[in-house]
């Protein structure tokens, strides 16, 4: 009689092989349930159009911020620091605000991309132009600066050294920290249903971020207004020119191709 088991298991009894089958069945079922839970979580977190815009912009930001760092070391770099920058002291403790900004952006972006489709499409189009303008500034104004020597042994100094070790003194003007923080606050200001306290919190946090980027010597003063302008101009244009129509046009084109 021909065995129903695979060749490697010809000499394994059912009592030995059976539990393995049950284990694989249970494991497969758990993986399937885990996949369903992840899908349900994603749907509850953001609508489909919100995920589409978020993932596209996140990928574009990575493409803008990291690949051009390969070219910048070979370009003639500019020092945009002024006498006022030299008077700003180095304060390692401000690295906490600098790092907490990433969590603040994540929370705010979730709130923004949960809004109505018109709102999401308009803000996404504005952020798209913001990223393109930022990339143009990075290439046309290849600014750099000299980091201070961090010799402290305290916790904050260790964090600063960690940031310096994974970063490079390029892509400075405008400050992406200021760009993202201002964009988040500005979009919250025009969004309905956002608690007033959270809008005020984001404005205060924006001011703290502007201070942190110069106190930890990641940027110079001119990078701050540059970041505000690069964020504000696209938002004004998007609202006046109704750039949400771009999102609707792309959605309609995708729908027609899917038919």
Please report, for each region that a protein language model flagged, where it lies by residue.
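Membrane-interface loops
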Residues: 69-83, 113-197, 245-259
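N-terminal transmembrane-helix/juxtamembrane module of multi-pass inner/ER membrane proteins
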Residues: 29-105, 151, 160, 258-259
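Short, positively charged and aromatic/hydrophobic N-terminal segments
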Residues: 13-26
């Amino acid at each position: 009689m021909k065995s129903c088991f695979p060749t490697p298991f010809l000499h394994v009894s059912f009592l030995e092989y059976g539990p393995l089958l049950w284990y694989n069945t249970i494991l497969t079922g758990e993986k399937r349930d885990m996949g369903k839970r992840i899908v349900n979580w994603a749907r509850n977190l953001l609508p489909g159009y919100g995920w589409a815009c978020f993932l596209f912009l996140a990928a574009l930001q990575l493409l803008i911020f990291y690949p051009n760092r390969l070219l910048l070391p070979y370009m003639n770099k500019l020092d945009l620091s002024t006498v006022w920058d030299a008077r700003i002291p180095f304060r390692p403790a401000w690295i906490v605000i600098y790092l907490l900004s990433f969590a603040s952006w994540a929370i705010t972006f979730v709130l923004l991309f949960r809004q109505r489709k018109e709102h999401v499409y308009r803000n996404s189009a504005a952020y798209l132009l913001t990223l393109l303008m930022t990339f143009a500034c990075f290439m046309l104004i290849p600014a750099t600066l000299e980091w201070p020597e961090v010799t402290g042994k305290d916790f904050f100094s260790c964090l600063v050294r960690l940031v310096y070790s994974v970063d490079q003194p390029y892509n400075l003007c405008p400050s992406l920290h200021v760009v993202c923080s201002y964009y988040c606050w500005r979009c919250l200001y025009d969004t309905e249903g956002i608690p007033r306290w959270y809008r005020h919190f984001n404005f205060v946090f924006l001011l703290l971020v502007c201070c942190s980027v110069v106190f930890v010597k990641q940027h110079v003063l001119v990078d701050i207004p540059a970041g505000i302008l690069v964020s504000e101009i696209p938002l004004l244009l998007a609202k006046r020119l109704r750039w949400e129509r771009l999102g609707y046009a792309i959605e309609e084109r995708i729908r027609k191709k899917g038919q």
